[in-house]
Amino acid sequence: LTLKEIKIFDCGSLNPDVLRFPQPPRKNIPGEKIPTLQEVFDLLAEYPNNNIWLNIEIKISPEFKVTAPIDVFVKAVVQVIEHNNAANKVNIQSFDWRVLESVKIQAPYIKTAALLGQSTFKSINDSVPSPWLNGIHFENSGGTALAILHEAQNYIDIFSPSWRLIMPKDSLFLGNTVNELKNNGFPVIPWTINRTKTMEKVILQGVDGIITDYPDSLLMVMEKMGIKRR
């Protein structure tokens, strides 16, 4: 799609999932369009005294060749960040770890966050790694979250896994607690946590942040637990 075509979509009213995002509490804003990254920075410029950090995700699938080449995609994003002198106010995250390596090659001063899903770490077979991990074979590397992070430590600053992967009692636990990951230099920001009970559980585990569709719920939990906003 061209930018002109994307701008036709009314993202302020059309709800792709009424079960996940019921109304209320979701509020309609008719006519709202999908912004470009530059338009997001323009909006932030209206609030210069607010400490706002952008978590920018580059969505590329190694399984479907439907986007621009990785280096081209990354370069376009980095250029907008640098144009706005915002390198110290962003991090770039991606499920495709090749993206993160490209970011560090092009702009080593920009922080990166490695997204990891409940299936993206799984190798194809004994000799072929997951296409998402930039050539790292999960099982052959040691079969833990920390093992694959150590192999990618030159281009990963933050670990952002599905929250179930860091919960010791969960069947999907990848072998390392939040404290172990943090003690090895990897801040932990799990996704996507929308239930308040789960928010409380991961906060007690010591996570550095939470990705959620409901920041208002997270703020309520933080207030209940006596946690101040940074």
Go through each PLM region and give its residues.
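Metal-dependent phosphodiesterase/phospholipase catalytic core, i.e.
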Residues: 1-120, 132-136, 140-148, 154-156, ...
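C-terminal active-site rim and adjoining tail of enzyme catalytic domains
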Residues: 115-116, 122-230
